[in-house]
Amino acid sequence: MLNGLTRVSTSSELESILDIVQSSGEIAVVFTSPSIGDLETITSETQRRQLRIAGIPRGGYTILPAIPLYDDELLQMCERYTSANEYEKAEMRNSLYMREYPLFTYSIRHQRALFHPADYVSRILQFCSYYVQAPDADVLPLQDKSPFLHISPIKEICKHLRLIARGTPVAPDDSESPVPEQLRLHAESDAEKLAAERATAMSIATSSGGASETEQPSLFSGVAPSALFQKGAVEEVDKDAEDTMEDLTGEETVDAVHSFQAEYLTLDGFELVTKASIYYDREGEGQRVVAVYIPGGVPEDTCRAAAAVLEPAATKKNLRAPTNGGLPPDTGIVGYYDYLTNPTQHKCRETEYSRRNWGLLAQSEPLLKHLDKLYSQLAPMHHHLQRVAIPSQYQLCGTVFSTITVNRNFRTAVHTDKGDFRSGLGVLSVINGEFEGCHLAIKRLKKAFQLKVGDVLLFDTSLEHGNTEVVNPEIHWQRTSVVCYLRTGLMSSVCEMERRKHLNRLILLQLLNTEVRNTTVNINGADSSLPPLFVPTRLASHLAPVQLAALGFIVERTEKQSGCVVAMTMGLGKTLVALTLCFSQLHLAPQADILILTPKPIISHWVDEKNKWGMHGLHFPHFVASDGLNSLEFEQQLLEYERQRNNEKPKLGHIFVINGEYLAGFLRRFKRFTPLLMIVDEGHRVAAKGNKLTESLDRLRCNLRIVLSGTPLQNDASELYRLVGWVNKGVSRVLPPKRFQELANDINQFVEGDDGAFYNAVMAQEYIQDWMRGFVFREMENDLPPLHDYLLICGSSDVQREYEEKLGLTETAMTALKATEHRPHHLSTHPACYLAFISDSYQSMVSGWTVRAQSNTSRPRVSQLEEIDTMRLEQYVQLVENEQLDAFIDLSGKMRVLVDIVLRVQARKEKLIIFSLYVGSQDLIHRTLTALRVCTFTVRGRDSQDRRRRAMQEFSENKDLIVLVLSTKIAAYGLDFTAANHVVLFDSWWNPQVDAQAIARAYRRNQRKPVTVYRLISATENKFVLRSQTRKIALFKCILHERTSRQALPDELEDCAANEKDEERRIFWAKLKTTSLAGDSRALLNVYRYQESVRESE
């Protein structure tokens, strides 16, 4: 092993020298020679191994190991180390051995490391500390002695920190600036300057022919910077539009006023509070903090210094006249705001005043820091949740505040503040003025808080509040107050995608003119305040903007040890988002384990996605997936993992993809299993009350919990509350379950048709949306082709009507029939299906084996058919055997409509999926279509994963295979059938999200055609299912789509057959409406657009 600086004779071979440097961590000096090679040979081989090269001593070159840290990490470490005392330095050196070094693992590759990367980092820190503090006389000789001063970024970091230590200002425009711009790249101007400087530097290096240092390996391999991201994922800046539109948007509605006439409060009926106190919204269970009063909380001189720069922000250019008696008050917004409803190029950005006065606003930092400290001390859980939620780039002076509202001489009428983070509190303080009165009164508490200069009030801004009267208003009075808070709109998917596009643009500018360097790229690398997010470079261009935004949202929460819910509509690629997250986590912590919990039918989908994207660099050496069967391969993988846990082999990170049923057994086998990250697919299952799965998961010590679900809200709003509470336990401490249920009840009351509940529903809806934004990434929209979704109300044949009357299919009777399992859906499918079902057995029309009709000994069942029923069943079988198919089909309205839809799709040379919940219906459909010579394939819930995979492949590749018949509740999950652009829901389930999952098998990413959905509704059981569905859809829209919605009344639904815009469909509807069933009733009674079954309120 080499010691210190080793001279290598010219007879040594270059390969052996580089092997020694790479494995031992020592440095070596080489000279060009026939046996070593020329400069080009030395530099190219050094670069290939990711080693570093410095142009000293004179005539020779020094080879150094790869630096095992990223540039920004090294800069931060050197900053802390050079300013630390000796004890703190020793602590830092010790801590170096406790962290991961993914760059080191990659650079060593197949070599066996004979040193710890912490040793090398420690040497760099020690040298940097010496350089920063060295006398001027000692600095110049170091240039010829230390190779560290010849390689980036060490040389730039050392010179930069020395300038700071000496009090010398760093000129960013100086071409000799010691710190590379990429270390502090944040603004567009910085990025553009970097690109120009880098191009100039390369030109100079080429012309000089010197080699002070070989270029570091690039951030990625085989991908040009221009091809790194897909079109639409990078910010496009239109300077002309920005100049004309940015300053038109300083106005935004920030208050919710609840009446047309402003209501002003007086002290009458309010208790004046003058002493420090904390208030709750109720006594006993379910209470929550709503106000904390701190008189004299901030020194007056701190307040007045901040007032000098904040007061000019308060102008009459605002939309707050309704809370000021009809006249615009003097008020303004400082910091960041979400201009979601304005025609701006940037929806989330600095306010106009902030953009023009950032330099002056530094004088308000002591005030903000003081308020932030009070907040963390007196409402620690609210403060913690707000710190978790706030995006780092929107933090004002490192606090949990993104925004400040400045009010001057403004006595507000009663209002609530819109868009504030509801798991946090607003922080109000008076910072200047001479006045009497004008207390802040909160109606619900019946308290008025005296606020003089320096007094502070933390309070729930969703409660109605306003100022009391000013004493002696005829005397000139002055009062300036500020409210500091977090705007939840800054965490919307719109803002997340906008921010992601901006970061992508900076990354491209940062990588401009660089050489190929690595197979991964840190797509958060343009902003050092963000946690790293590593993505395979060949994969990045396949990630849609919404997927990149979701990844950014997740890693910001995991960095703060919080989980989150990813609520992306089906088909937007949640699985790829999750796998990319796993890649980044394992890149940073290669020995960590990750647990992915998913329903059994979807496990193969995860494996397929892993294999598919592995071709684009998404590699996982230890990806263990099983449905719980003790297969040989799975057992071998578990044994290998066991050996690593027992230290028999080096520990490597594993990803386990398992189903909930196997989880308990897995945890029994691997006690003290502690995953770094836990992902729950179709995570709405976690929200069920008394869920054993949740109990098992809660036993795992893992704070980083990610829930994936396109349908996080299935039946009621409390499910969303339990989901968010599961990913972040602190939520229930600031919003108790009882309070959330009250909000949910307000929404439910309106959804179910009580128009008088509209006002309360809107308030509750806004509160829940503002509460969940910090923990739920929502993207319910998509850029897919059009979706045409229809409700087809099918008629009944005379035989069906006869049995309907016999069964008494009223709504009351429907409930009774459900209890005894006489399912009217069999009758709506076909009389033959119904008669076979009640006889307790029928011959499967696909496989030829007898099915016991899902029999259950605990269920009463008619065991014998009446004679007429037996004759009819035999007659129906004869119709099929004699190929009198039209007569057989015309016995059912739904079957007649279905067959005509299938024949239309076949004539158009397109493909169709038919979903049904019931085996009897699936069999009957399959046999009927097969008899009609329509090529059909059926996939049921009991079918193996291999059969499903073959069905997918066959359906995609075989142009003759027109129809797939699938089980709705099982086969709908985890399958991709985008070859079809027509979907029939032959029957519907009480939970509309089950149907939504089914539709998403065809209506998802990679679908290139418009998709038409046909929901077949009979006059028997389905109308009650529909009523349940529309209520839940209205609730879903209220909470996740931010649209106040309710069920449509029967007389509000309009038959769209006659006014259908598509001529071919209009003709088709008309044909079905004139088609007669047995008994002369119409096959199709009405056609409605499904989206109109739920009405949105303005």
Swiss-Prot record:
ATP binds at residues 568-575. Residues 541-1098 are annotated as: DNA Helicase. It catalyses: ATP + H2O = ADP + phosphate + H(+); thymine + 2-oxoglutarate + O2 = 5-hydroxymethyluracil + succinate + CO2. It comes from Leishmania infantum. It comes from the Eukaryota. Binds 1 Fe(2+) ion per subunit. Gene3D superfamilies: 3.60.130.30, P-loop containing nucleotide triphosphate hydrolases, Tandem AAA-ATPase domain. Residues 897-1057 form the Helicase C-terminal domain. It holds the Pfam family SNF2-rel_dom. In the C-terminal section; belongs to the SNF2/RAD54 helicase family. In the N-terminal section; belongs to the TET family. JBP2 subfamily. Keywords: ATP-binding, Dioxygenase, DNA-binding, Helicase, Hydrolase, Iron, Metal-binding, Nucleotide-binding, Nucleus, Oxidoreductase. Residues 555-730 form the Helicase ATP-binding domain. GO terms for cellular component: nucleus. Its cofactor is Fe(2+). 2-oxoglutarate binds at residue 479. Its EC number is 3.6.4.12, 1.14.11.6. It is found in: Nucleus. Residues 1-540 are annotated as: Thymine dioxygenase. Dioxygenase that catalyzes the first step of DNA base J (beta-d-glucosyl-HOMedU) biosynthesis by converting thymine to 5-hydroxymethyluracil (HOMedU). DNA base J is a hypermodified thymidine residue found in the genome of kinetoplastid parasites, which is localized primarily to repetitive DNA, namely the telomeres, and is implicated in the regulation of antigenic variation. Probably also acts as a DNA helicase. Recognizes and binds specific regions of the genome, hydrolyzes ATP and allows the DNA base J de novo synthesis. A motif (DEAH box) lies at residues 681-684. GO terms for biological process: base J metabolic process; double-strand break repair via homologous recombination; reciprocal meiotic recombination. This is Bifunctional helicase and thymine dioxygenase JBP2. Fe cation binds at residues 415, 417, 465. SUPFAM superfamilies: P-loop containing nucleoside triphosphate hydrolases. One of its GO terms (molecular function) is thymine dioxygenase activity.
